Amino acid sequence: MNHVTVIGAGLAGSECAWQLAQRGVAVTLREMKPEKKTPAHVTDYFAELCCSNSLRGAGLENAVGLLKEELRRLNSLIMRCADATAVPAGGALAVDRDGFARMVTETIFSHPNITMIPGEVTSIPEGDVVIASGPLTSDPLAEAIAEKLGGGTTLNFFDAAAPLVSYDSVDMDSAYFASRYDKGTPDYINCPMTKEEYLAFWQALIAAEEAEVHGFEDKNVFEGCMPVEVMARRGEDTLRFGPLKPRGLVDPKTGKEPYAVVQLRRDNTDGSIYNLVGFQTHLKWPEQRRVFTMIPALRNAQFLRYGVMHRNTYLDSPRLLDRYYRLKAEPRIAFAGQMTGVEGYVESCASGFLAGVELARHLNGQTPIDFPAETAIGALGLYVSNGSVGDFQPMNINFGIIPPLDHRVKGKRNKNAELSQRSLEILEGIKQEVLWT
């Protein structure tokens, strides 16, 4: 039986290990938890969601919705567990954070072709290996990777997570349930603010004291997970046109849209925990309590977790990796997950999926499957391996990296729907080959 070592049991590593095992490959899965955790991890589960509990838009008019549907049709472990542990979230797919990670962990442990070895990995093993150790790779392994790749091949940015509050502590007399434009079910708690309340909150936020981030004073921040205080400093109204946007959220008490709205999204199945949408932060914890309780509905909020900030490291992938996430100079080594420069939970899963499927095919003597650029999975693989990219930055899946239609379509929503339909039709043509084990 062929053998592969997978380092890291996050979203990418778990998906990769499972896809390899499903195709008859013996997998040794190395994960440093529970012996050692990164600053962003709390539980001992695999596939722990360290930031939001949302896998973003569910519809096919969204590129991430297309990516999720492609993965579903190709028997993704992560998507199966996400769908099974979904919680109400309007037009998005959100999951019970612990229930999801527990299901992934139990599925991995129960697979006969996967052997789990806990403990920190400090060097790159011999033989075929997939490194999916994540953006918070421990220093010894990061040094081993840097030595293997040569200098100047890793970059970094900062990422942040939002606070969690208990539902019982939210003042529902000052809040209301609704989804934007009444789309889907009213799953979000909306915390309205008057102009005076918002301006006082904004002034306090931009003046609040931040936690120190040692050694990385450039404060390079990924736009998709920007700390709320960084966004606020861009201007008085930036938040009102971003995460605090009131459009489509009519307050039933006034019959009007508020001046600003803070949204809370359910974080677990029973609805006892909610997260502050768009409130990734690295303010000092006492400052978070002081500033965020200025939101009227959160004046007595019980914070179950404060926001945290951490460094994310990723590879200069276009110079290093091929479209199957393999190291060009040494193809026995592949990478997967956020460290390749894909950004987001679903994107990380997709990279692990593709790396696992293609490596299994190689070991089983089969030719690679070139996922077309018209598919979201293929577009991501081509993005991270595109050597013509000048300033490589982490990227969420988006329709901009998928080839356009050969005809004009009126309306962005209709155009995106057609792009998704084209992708899924192409996917059907290669589906059986991908699923062959």
What are these regions (language model features)?
Residues 48-59, 83-99:
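Dinucleotide-binding Rossmann-like beta1-alpha1 core, especially the glycine-rich loop
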Residues 18-80, 373-384:
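N-terminal FAD cofactor-binding segment of flavoenzymes
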Residues 110-285, 289-290:
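Predominantly flavin-linked oxidoreductase catalytic cores and closely associated redox partners
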Residues 394-437:
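C-terminal auxiliary extensions adjacent to catalytic cores
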Residues 97-116:
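Helical element adjacent to the flavin cofactor pocket in flavoenzyme catalytic cores
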Residues 276-342, 349-351, 369-386, 392-396, ...:
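A glycine-rich dinucleotide-binding beta-alpha-beta segment and adjacent secondary-structure elements
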Residues 1-12:
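Beta1/beta-strand and adjacent pyrophosphate-binding region of the FAD-binding site
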Residues 348-369:
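Internal hydrophobic alpha-helix adjacent to the cofactor/substrate pocket in enzyme cavities
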